[in-house]
Amino acid sequence: MKNRKLLRPALCLLLALLAGCGPSREEPMEPEAESRALLSSGDLRGADLRELDLTGLEEAAYRWDFDTRTLWPEELPEGFDPARLLELGKDPGLGLRALHGRGITGRGVGIAIIDQALPADHQEYGDRLRFYQEYHTAAQGPASAHGPAVASIALGKTVGVAPEALLYFLADDLGTGEGAAFSRDLSWYAEDVDRLTALNETLPEGESIRVISMSVGWMPGDPGAEALEAAIARARAAGIAVVCVNSRDPLLEPWMGMGRRPYGDPNRLEDCLPGAFWEESLYSGEYRGTDGSLLLVPMDGRTAASPAGGAEYAYFAGGGMSWAVPYVAGLYALACQVKPEVTFEEFLAAARSTARPVSVWRDGVEYPYGKAVDPAALLEALGA
């Protein structure tokens, strides 16, 4: 999943000679210039910003990603409180912590994830990591930001939906080649789904995999898509639910991620907002969820485990469906705890029947954008 563009030394020299400048004499970027470049990118994870004056950047500030290693200056945008944002982002929201307090934690339910490389020792999940294997180029590089994020959103001890679920994790690639030569191919993910299905047959009672989470989507004609869909069908036939991004699958089509006011309470629907990546489509009339058919879970403004260290965290202003998928997998793990025989079809029906409408006002117009999942009501409908 890591796409590195590598140039051979001879090619580098040839390009330099053609440019008429010989070897590069470009001076290193000054620290302040480097910091300002990071500000423009919006990714401030690990950045040292102490020499900057960030006042006046209120509009941009709430789109920044940062982590517990970001070093902030004294001069911050007015009202911007990164520590508070990070702490609020740890709350999975929708009343889940109240359910955790009642013992509904996904205890003993297996969640399998296929994603990028994972640091195995993070405090959010390390003590419940039952199986971890890397394949292909995922085994050649360091842990990514994506892997620990999706794992912790699903089952993290403090940030996760199912904080006592068990983790089975495969790190693999979504294709072959590197850089411009990268070619997307889902065949390896198909093999991984089959690996997990086979692994599940060997697991002791009380530790079985009930759901596979893959933060990936595809089109029918993509290389390997047919093989992956066949593997998913085999997993489902073996009693394992599979959650990914697939609007052509009736079990997955309804799910969508939503946002939240920066300092809003993650447990109050009044503080929910349209998702950052699809908000404009709501106002333009292109959004497909205005009829209330979509089921919404938290996606933006989330804090997750970081690969920077076993106790480090990263805050993501905008999440994308990559963060919504493990959230749904975690919800299903809770359902499996309260009703071990539950199917994903039953879970989906209960989610639909108990979800609550949400809308947003803009320029005097109310825009409905779906229904927020109500975990307590969902689980009660299943017999919790």
Could you say what each language-model-derived stretch is?
Residues 18-20:
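C-terminal motif of bacterial Sec signal peptides marking the signal peptidase cleavage site
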Residues 22-24:
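Bacterial signal peptide processing site
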Residues 26-89:
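Autoinhibitory propeptides
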Residues 32-39, 100, 106, 174-262, ...:
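Substrate-binding/access-modulating region of protease and related hydrolase catalytic domains
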Residues 83-111, 134-140, 276-278, 373-374:
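N-terminal domain-start motif of subtilase-like serine proteases
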Residues 98-111, 116-131, 139-187, 205-209, ...:
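Subtilisin-like serine protease catalytic core
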Residues 115, 237-240, 245-337, 341:
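Extracellular S/T/G-rich loop segment that most often corresponds to the catalytic His/Ser-adjacent loop
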Residues 205-213, 337-384:
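C-terminal subdomain of the subtilisin-like protease fold in secreted/lumenal serine endopeptidases
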